[in-house]
A protein has these predicted regions:
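Membrane-interface helix-cap regions at the ends of transmembrane helices
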Residues: 7, 30-33, 37, 41, ...
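Glycine-/small-residue-enriched transmembrane alpha-helix faces in small-molecule transporters
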Residues: 1-46, 85, 93, 153-180, ...
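Hydrophobic transmembrane alpha-helices of multi-pass small-molecule transport proteins
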Residues: 59, 81, 87, 120, ...
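Hydrophobic alpha-helical transmembrane segments of multi-pass integral membrane proteins
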Residues: 15-20, 46-61, 65, 77-78, ...
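Loop-to-transmembrane alpha-helix entry segments
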Residues: 73-78, 110, 126-146, 154-161, ...
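C-terminal-most transmembrane helix of multi-pass membrane proteins
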Residues: 2-10, 52, 149-150, 220-222, ...
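Helix-helix packing/entry segments at the starts of transmembrane helices
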Residues: 25, 50, 106-112, 178-199, ...
């Protein structure tokens, strides 16, 4: 392969990784749709068991047709165990917070995870924080503040906030571990094992909190199926490629589209008002995403043309 072909391949992977980062954020931003199952009396662990259980079945079928081996070595086992437990903790604490505060508010507070990701990478892995990265973090964080700040001074649940912050921290570490583990396997295989931990963990939590609850009607099953395919399978698969091709911090910052998606769901599906404050917040978040994407592409071009 010539140098030009190699450089073109690297550039295409960078673009693909950026698109996957955006896609993962939008897909994951549809998580609030699952909160409507709470109106039927379902608890977070039961909702998540069906979500991850169905996702696991779909992934298993895909892998069967791909004839992909499930064999892993000891290092991969430890890495996949860590990823599974981290995603289990992040998803469960987020869905628990949905019972204590508005899902849109919880989804926007979750966005502190890019700040945590950048901080962890700088503190423990000596990753340099450039001006554009810092600017993106500031713009996106201010945008999120505008999305969930209430002018009437409404007080949020302290327990709910703590749960969301735990979700953000474990999600940030998940992204970093995914990037640092350098797992030489397909995204389907990675998520096959991640989903095992998530499904079994939530099943155990469900039985510890009164027993597993089953969706009672077609609408509920449709909602669970959506949660299994979109924010579980699609988001997880795209997250693998994003972290692999563009790194932890850009992937996390592109997650700014998660709260934006949550707000748009509230506006178009639940009739929530669209105010100038929301418009400014969304604009700042999109600006942050554009800056980090341009910064990533500029860095790639510099490395290709010394």
């Amino acid at each position: 392969m010539s140098d030009n072909q190699h450089n073109t391949l690297r550039t295409n992977k960078k673009i693909f990784g950026t698109l996957c980062g955006i896609g993962a954020a939008v897909c994951y931003g549809t998580n609030p749709l699952g909160a409507q199952l709470y109106s039927e009396g379902m608890q977070p662990a039961s909702v998540l068991f069906w979500r991850f259980g169905l996702a696991f079945i779909i992934i298993a079928i895909v892998m069967m047709f791909r004839k992909e081996s499930l064999r892993i070595n000891r290092r991969e086992f430890y890495a996949l165990t860590g990823l599974g437990l981290l995603f289990l903790a992040s998803s469960l604490t987020l869905y628990m917070s949905f019972k204590l505060m508005a899902v849109g508010v919880a989804s926007t507070i979750l966005f502190v995870y890019p700040v945590l990701t950048a901080g962890i990478m700088a503190l423990f892995f000596k990753e340099r924080l450039t001006f554009s990265t810092i600017l993106s973090i500031v713009l996106s964080f201010v945008g999120v503040l505008l999305l969930y700040w209430s002018p009437d001074g409404t007080r949020l649940s302290a327990t709910g906030i703590v749960l969301v912050l735990i979700s953000a921290l474990t999600y940030a570490v998940y992204i970093i571990v995914m990037n640092r583990a350098k797992l030489n396997m397909s995204s389907f295989k990675i998520n096959f094992y991640v989903l095992i931990y998530c499904a079994l963990g939530n099943l155990a939590m469900a039985f510890c909190s009164g027993g597993l609850q089953v969706p009672q009607n077609a609408t509920s099953w449709l909602c669970v199926s959506w949660l299994a395919v979109v924010p579980a399978i699609l988001a997880l698969v795209m997250m693998v490629y994003a972290a692999k091709y563009i790194g932890s911090t850009p992937t996390a910052i592109m997650g700014a589209l998660e709260p934006t998606t949550a707000v748009l769901i509230g506006i178009f599906l639940f009739g929530e008002p669209f105010t100038s404050r929301l418009a400014v917040g969304i604009a700042l978040i999109f600006a942050a995403v554009i800056i980090i994407a341009l910064k990533s592409n500029k860095k790639e071009k510099a490395s290709l043309n010394p």
